[in-house]
Amino acid sequence: MDKIILIDGNSLSYRAFYAMPALKNKKGLYTNSVYGFTLMLEKILADTNPKYALVAFDKGKQTFRHQSYEAYKGTRDKTPSELVEQFGYVRELLDSYGIKYEEHFDYEADDIIGSYAKIAEKEGLEVIIVTGDKDLTQLASENIAIYYTKRGVTDIDYYTPEFIAEKYGLTPEQIVDMKGLMGDKSDNIPGIAGVGEKTAIKLLTEYKTVENVLDNIDNISGKKLKERLTEGREDALLSKKLATIYTEVPVDNKLEDLTYSENIELKRELFEKLEFVSFLRKLSQETPSEEAGEVAEENASPKKEINIVLADKNTKIDFTDSTFHVECYTEDYHNSDVVGIVVYKEGTAYIFSEEQFFTNEFVVDYLQSEITKTVYDFKKILFIAKRNGVDINGEVFDVKILSYLIDVNAKTEIDKIIFNYLGKIISSDEEIYGKGAKRTLPAQEVINPYIAEIAESISLIKPLMEEKLSEENMVDLYKDIEIKVAKVLANMEFEGIHVSKKALEEMSEEFDERIKTLEASIYALAGSEFNIASPKQLGVVLFEDLGLPPIKKTKTGYSTAVEVLEQLQHSHEIIPLIMEYRTITKLNSTYAKGLVKDITREGKIHTRYEQTLAQTGRLSSVNPNLQNIPTRIEEGKKIRKAFVPASDDRVILSIDYSQIELRVLAHIAQDAGMIDAFKHDVDIHTKTASDVNGVSLDEVTSSMRREAKAVNFGIVYGISDFGLSNNLGITRKRAKEFIDKYLETFKGVDKYMTDIVDFAKEHGYVETLFNRRRALPDINAKNKIVANLNARIAMNSPIQGTAADIIKIAMVNVFEYLEKTNVDAKLLLQVHDELIFDVNKDIEEEFTKEMIKIMEEAANLDVQLKAEASSGASWYDAK
């Protein structure tokens, strides 16, 4: 039987756009939707080998359905401009395949597809409909199957009458009845309020159609349901009508016109223009030609099956020009099993268990040699090597870190990197292992080819990244800072920090008592007991029982968000108690109780650092997050009392940079006033208040200094008069006057802010003093809100990013000193601008001086960096 494929062009374009990474060609044209559409088309044509094909598109926003219901599809968001610009290229793609496309005023793509499907079915063809929209499933029949793209563009459910019966217990014809009862949010079809899918299916199982359900309301049990059906009668009938596909559109083509034949040259031209390297490579293999195009020639290489060898501790490998990959069951490699380690070289993948890998003398020699290691996620690999008693030497080429440096906006999961650089889709972590409670370890027959393909892909990506890194002048940033920081972090993670379980439990007992006291006080003021943690119940108490003025409403009731409570804190004495209750319960659950589960048998907590997450270059801490322990309130600070040295003859030493971002700003902006203040060690906030208010340093009041401090720290974040007035509780007029006077006083800062935004608009990025680049693709956006946000990022990123680079350089230099001298001290934690050490008391004074020197010499600025130290019997005592 001959086949015809009918493709929902709009649906698939949207699905591809949101499923694919935000790909662009070198000219800045978004290409992700076209790429995903091409993937889908290639797969469908290869899988089905149809004789006929057609793609249907929507034409215009209004259809005959709007005459019945003006709000039809009225809740849909505006199509993103990044997708709109690709629609024309999707049509060019279809031209290159020789596939016709069709659109009609007054009808939707679904109607066109439905009309052709019925014509083709009558002619005895097998009909395959490809869509990301379940509306078309109503057309399923013995000869019509719907290929529904449920996730991405190549993950498909096959809707046949049998599948629909199994999934819903309904026939395809009843799909419109189901939508008549339950509605369809995506199309703004109302349905009957309060009737969901389960109820609709139950009713249709018994009564078959919407009309029959409505005719039998008296026989249906449930008072509330009867009321809903009675009140929603007209909506149900209208909704069914809206959901029903019209199958008599006056179509443009006869079936015999829908045969297709690809045009290789058109394909090649389009793929070269859009820079679809993998498709060009495939094209060059299928149609070898001297004029295969530069991109195809450069990247063409015949696809070979990877030879998989199960290796053990005796396997000998020549590691020159190899890549290796360590695959863990979960991303938490501190506690995860290694499911396989693969070494890839020249088409062969050697797969080891963790034990066999690290007991293989050839492997250990390789790891400790100066041979370059090409990997994904060096920090993880080094941590796992250390737990096996092995260190890693030599240069390291880490595609995860490099992907992050080259495009800080790109995702760094290995499947995303492979797609971005090779245009190749491999299974995602979720597809291999599952998600959440359904996560399971598949058989080695699944794992081995998967990790082999990853290792092979890493080897192919390496030369592409090397070229890009050099182009963007970030070789030194990678070699001198980032890859060395990865080694420091792996060692810090492996070392961990001692935490007193007893101290945490004592704090938790104190918090429990305080929570009980707060609850009693809150209940007394409220006049009744209620769940304080429930926003809904709290909203009723505050805004109905106590009569406080509502500030904001949500879908479920009154908003009791922190910003709402802050506005109300002087309105009633219950508000400060509720705010304190929230603070104490959070400290108790997250830290006093929460951290206990993270303490290992050795009495330590091993946080994990994210090196490729923050767009500014800063490090973050997870599992647990030790950077977010609150320090503005005493109860939060006390959590740090539990973080202690390894023994009584040691101390916790904290050294942090003083006002590093302002010092960086003074240097980059070359502001004479700021530079002078720092050079003469004048308090920068007092100096700012003095200059802006036109008073002497001695005349600066605490409120003046507070205003100056807020502007100093907020100015390069693009703080507005509105933001400053909220922060300080002053009028917008006063805030504007202060900002204007500030910029008039610090002309270098004002000039920097203007110049850096102009640079970003011209070049599309900004960078730090150490060439860390942050792309700003939307700096010239027509949307003023988006453009202004990017302008603020442009002002801030060089400052915050340079500060991040400096602390990283300091970490590298500190770690190298520790390794070189073998001094009795350990680097334990990094928290923003602060380094935490465990130090023997006997060497504390000398060691502290050396660390301050190293940190203050990490960068050569026109303003001297300043590091300040403190120590004590715990992290709390060291501050």
Positions of PLM-derived features:
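Conserved "right-hand" nucleotidyltransferase catalytic core of DNA-directed polymerases
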Residues: 232-354, 417, 437-634, 647-651, ...
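Extended two-metal-dependent nuclease catalytic cores across DNA- and RNA-processing enzymes
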Residues: 2, 21-25, 74-250
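Conserved catalytic core of nucleic-acid polymerases
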Residues: 440, 487, 494, 606-607, ...
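Extended, highly charged clamp/arch subdomains and adjacent linkers
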Residues: 1-56, 61-73, 85-88, 233, ...
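Charged catalytic and DNA/RNA-contacting regions of genome-maintenance
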Residues: 128-130, 136-173, 337, 342-346, ...
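Conserved RNase H-like, two-metal-ion catalytic cores of nucleic-acid enzymes
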Residues: 15-54, 70-71, 75-82, 91-94, ...
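C-terminal polymerase-core module
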Residues: 513-520, 524-576, 744-792, 796-798, ...
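Function-dense linear segments that define catalytic or interfacial modules
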Residues: 343-347, 406-411, 415-435, 450-452, ...
